[in-house]
Amino acid sequence: MKVDGGLGLSPNIEKIAKEARSQEERGYDGIWTAETSHDPFLPLTIAAEHTQNLELGTSIAVAFARNPMVLANIGWDLQALSKGRFNLGLGSQIKPHITKRFSMEWSKPAARMREMVSAMRAIWNTWMTGEKLEFRGDFYTHTLMTPFFTPDKGDLGDFGAPKVYLAGVGELMTQVAGEVCDGFIAHGFTTEKYLREVTLPNLAIGREKAGK
């Protein structure tokens, strides 16, 4: 069993390096950040520079406040900096926050999330293989990638692209996690009964759709 720690909901930037080192020295396997009153990625950049073995992840970053290209860049750079230790944990948030706080569109969140993750993986594939970027969906279209904007595929070494985790509560979003993601993040209020009767069966449905 792995035991992970965290940097809290509002980490003090000046103390992140010390706290990350401390958690690694105490034997934690990973350290995670949340997107609340601060950016979730900056603390992990600092933690990556001051640790050697801790897995690093967001739990969660708000997916719909960004687009696939932005997330692909962030994920790529943190994976490179951490030498393969980064896990990109995403969540949808709820409609009022997306439309009123972030001023972004909200529609069909499960379908949009599936497409967002698929688009992000298509971008990573282009950067790693040199294949033409040709992603066309209902919500996102990415068809332009020139050498000037392409990261060096050697950045990631043998690590490959980051793992993608998805938070969910409802049945459809949970199915998306099973279908297109590498892991699932349960809500803190989720009960054992709900996990057993709703979450696990819907993860299985998603995995079956993907032939996993």
Regions found by a protein language model. Give the residues of each.
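Internal, glycine-rich beta/alpha segment that forms the wall or movable "lid"
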Residues: 72-183, 190-211
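Glycine-enriched alpha-helix->loop->beta-strand junction motifs that scaffold or abut catalytic
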Residues: 27-29, 50-54, 82, 176-185
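Structural motif corresponding to the early beta-alpha repeats
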Residues: 58-70, 74
